[in-house]
From Swiss-Prot:
<feature type="active site" description="Proton donor">
    <location>
        <position position="138"/>
    </location>
</feature>
<keyword id="KW-0521">NADP</keyword>
<dbReference type="InterPro" id="IPR023940">
    <property type="entry name" value="DHDPR_bac"/>
</dbReference>
<dbReference type="Pfam" id="PF01113">
    <property type="entry name" value="DapB_N"/>
</dbReference>
<feature type="binding site">
    <location>
        <begin position="78"/>
        <end position="80"/>
    </location>
    <ligand>
        <name>NAD(+)</name>
    </ligand>
</feature>
<keyword id="KW-0963">Cytoplasm</keyword>
<protein>
    <recommendedName>
        <fullName>4-hydroxy-tetrahydrodipicolinate reductase</fullName>
        <ecNumber>1.17.1.8</ecNumber>
    </recommendedName>
</protein>
<dbReference type="GO" id="GO:0050661">
    <property type="term" value="F:NADP binding"/>
</dbReference>
<feature type="binding site">
    <location>
        <position position="29"/>
    </location>
    <ligand>
        <name>NADP(+)</name>
    </ligand>
</feature>
<dbReference type="GO" id="GO:0005829">
    <property type="term" value="C:cytosol"/>
</dbReference>
<keyword id="KW-0028">Amino-acid biosynthesis</keyword>
<feature type="binding site">
    <location>
        <position position="28"/>
    </location>
    <ligand>
        <name>NAD(+)</name>
    </ligand>
</feature>
<keyword id="KW-0560">Oxidoreductase</keyword>
<dbReference type="InterPro" id="IPR036291">
    <property type="entry name" value="NAD(P)-bd_dom_sf"/>
</dbReference>
<dbReference type="InterPro" id="IPR022663">
    <property type="entry name" value="DapB_C"/>
</dbReference>
<dbReference type="GO" id="GO:0008839">
    <property type="term" value="F:4-hydroxy-tetrahydrodipicolinate reductase"/>
</dbReference>
<dbReference type="GO" id="GO:0051287">
    <property type="term" value="F:NAD binding"/>
</dbReference>
Length: 248
């Protein structure tokens, strides 16, 4: 497998560290790799690759999708902070090439989604709250993974997200789900779903201890994706070995 890394920050470096023989090019405007050719843009890259792993920035999405479509290259998109309009462009592009898009590449988050699918239908009498914690350099809130978990819950229960309560000063409604974000220190990522019932609590929590878990997940996604036809693939379908599907 021949890979290009699009975005050579901390997680991109870990991808290179974990798969040194597979990475044949790095694309980043400000950073270079010593062992392989480095380019400022995808258009400059001369190597042919089986897949591109993207840990860059939403502003680079148009060029990434255009390159993928032009060269028929599968894309693993792990960048966070996309708008709904940008997510729609990913969906549109996936009708032409295989795209794997997830805000969190860890196996544990896929397991957490499966646990929620089991628990949410059973916990109709419980209030649900969602808390995410990240390092003090993260700019988007709530995190993309928190939004992913929210959508998983909403597929099973009619709940509306509430992002702050100070302005309303009203009691909590049964169909609400509180979304809470904390930023500080060097927290890699922590996500917790709280089910609050009468005199009892149920908590599901995932903590990432290193960015390597995201890099490893991206490599596994690339290995699976190069065998697939056009479509938009998710972390959940990869790890549960279900058939691929396009998200409309």
């Amino acid at each position: 497998m021949r890979l290009a890394i699009h975005g050579y920050g901390a997680t991109g470096h870990y991808v290179h560290e974990l798969a040194p023989d597979a990475v044949v090019a790095v694309i980043d405007k400000t950073k270079t790799a010593e062992q392989v050719p480095s380019y400022g843009t995808l258009a400059e890259m001369t190597e042919s690759v089986d897949a591109i792993i993207d840990f860059s920035h939403p502003s680079l999405l148009p060029d990434l999708l255009a390159y993928g479509i032009k060269t028929k290259t599968p894309l693993v998109i792990a960048t966070t902070g996309f708008s709904e309009a940008e997510l729609q462009t990913i969906r549109d592009a996936s009708t032409q090439i295989p795209i794997f898009q997830s805000y969190n590449m860890s196996f544990g988050i896929a397991m957490m989604q499966q646990l929620l699918k089991t628990l949410v239908p059973l916990a109709g009498a419980f209030d649900i709250e969602l808390l995410e914690k990240h390092h003090n350099q993260k700019v988007d809130a709530p995190s993309g993974t928190a939004e992913l978990l929210l959508r998983t819950i909403q597929d099973l229960r009619d709940v509306q997200p509430v992002y702050e309560r100070e302005s309303t000063r009203e009691k909590r409604e049964p169909n609400e789900i509180g979304m809470h974000s904390m930023r500080g220190g060097t927290i890699f990522g922590e996500h917790e779903v709280l089910f609050a019932g009468v005199d009892e609590l149920i908590e599901i929590k995932h903590t990432a201890l290193s960015k390597k878990v995201f890099a490893s997940g991206a490599i596994k996604a690339a290995e699976a994706l190069i065998q697939k036809s056009a479509g938009l693939y998710t972390l959940e379908t990869l790890y549960t070995q279900e058939d691929s599907h396009v998200i409309n």
